Amino acid sequence: MVGYDAKADVRSNSKLEVAVAGSVSGFVTRALISPLDVIKIRFQLQIERLCPSDPNAKYHGIFQAAKQILQEEGPRAFWKGHVPAQILSIGYGAVQFLAFEELTELLYQANLYQTHQFSAHFVCGGLSAGTATLTVHPVDVLRTRLAAQGEPKIYNNLREAIRTMYKTEGPFVFYKGLTPTVIAIFPYAGLQFSCYRSLKRAYDWLIPPDGKQTGNLKNLLCGCGSGVISKTFTYPLDLIKKRLQVGGFEHARSAFGQVRSYRGLLDLTQQVLQEEGTRGFFKGLSPSLMKAALSTGFMFFWYELFCNLFHCIRREDR
């Protein structure tokens, strides 16, 4: 179960088990959804409309983009930036789930958990994700740069990317886009955790448990639903974050169409509104929703699966 549960205390996992389950969950999920992530980033960074009628648009649909990336860059392009992305996922998953379990237990002990469970999961989910974000944000910037570049590559590997970015743009380059990231991640993760719990309760109400082992399917479906809900509400901030993260990297984006430079969060928002309209804030929403559904579904699925596995191993050892 995700979050502290006093009734299930006898089968609670240790802090190490929670961290490992979160890390493995992040690792497996990232490997599976990386192609959608690459397509989503390409859409978010494209200035032109995502429309077949626009002759200047390099990408205008999920399948068209996938086909073009495959033809121009080969299948490995769908895992561009995968090494930093995996470092990001492993570290993020460990910190997020460990912080969430600790925070929900803290609220339970303060008698604030039982009567406000949706709010408790929202706040704890947001705070745990914020903590994880501050920990791994430099890796997220590296992942975005590596996934966004075309051919020929500006950075051939992770080490070269770190060295070049630090030398040409300074140490603060690794925290580009941090403000919108933190602003976006709190409600996004908060909704992920709170909606996940609510959807599981709704699932049990619609399909009462009959003793059969259907928990894994329930975790997957409810995770997918919570991912779609949370991403829909917070997507514009995700787009803003991605565009800020590639600031100073415009020369590597020239092959993809128009490029823009932004002085900050407000300047970016104004430029997008003026040039692309409100729909500009939702570029790449389709692959992003697909990714959010799969990534959140798999995240909770694998996390609960490994937590249960650790519990079974400990029970067998007794």
UniProtKB/Swiss-Prot annotation:
Q: Which GO terms describe its biological process?
A: thiamine diphosphate biosynthetic process; thiamine pyrophosphate transmembrane transport
Report which reactions are catalysed by this protein. Answer: thiamine phosphate(out) + thiamine diphosphate(in) = thiamine phosphate(in) + thiamine diphosphate(out)
Which ranges does the record mark as transmembrane? 19-39, 87-107, 122-142, 173-193, 220-240, 293-313
Q: Which GO terms describe its molecular function?
A: antiporter activity; thiamine pyrophosphate transmembrane transporter activity
Record motif Substrate recognition, residues: 241-246
What Pfam families would the database entry show? Mito_carr (PF00153)
Q: Please give the PROSITE patterns that the UniProt record associates with this protein.
A: SOLCAR (PS50920)
Q: Which UniProt keywords apply?
A: Antiport, Membrane, Mitochondrion, Repeat, Transmembrane, Transmembrane helix, Transport
Give the InterPro entries listed for this entry. Mit_carrier (IPR002067), Mitochondrial_sb/sol_carrier (IPR018108), Mt_carrier_dom_sf (IPR023395)
- Judging by the UniProt lineage, the source's domain of life is Eukaryota
Repeats (Solcar): which ranges?
13-106, 116-202, 214-309
Keyword Chloroplast part of the UniProt annotation: no
Location in or out of the cell: Mitochondrion membrane
> Phenotype when inactivated?
Deficient mice are embryonically lethal, with death occurring on or before day 11 of the embryo development. Knockout of Slc25a19 causes mitochondrial thiamine pyrophosphate depletion, embryonic lethality, CNS malformations and anemia.
One Gene Ontology CC term in the entry: mitochondrion
Q: Which SUPFAM superfamilies match?
A: Mitochondrial carrier
Give the membrane topology, semicolon-separated if more than one.
Multi-pass membrane protein
Here the disulfide bonds are none
Give the similarity note: Belongs to the mitochondrial carrier (TC 2.A.29) family.
Role summary:
Mitochondrial transporter mediating uptake of thiamine diphosphate into mitochondria. It is not clear if the antiporter activity is affected by the membrane potential or by the proton electrochemical gradient.
Protein name, as recorded: Mitochondrial thiamine pyrophosphate carrier
The root-end lineage is: Eukaryota, Metazoa, Chordata, Craniata, Vertebrata
| Gene (UniProt) | Slc25a19
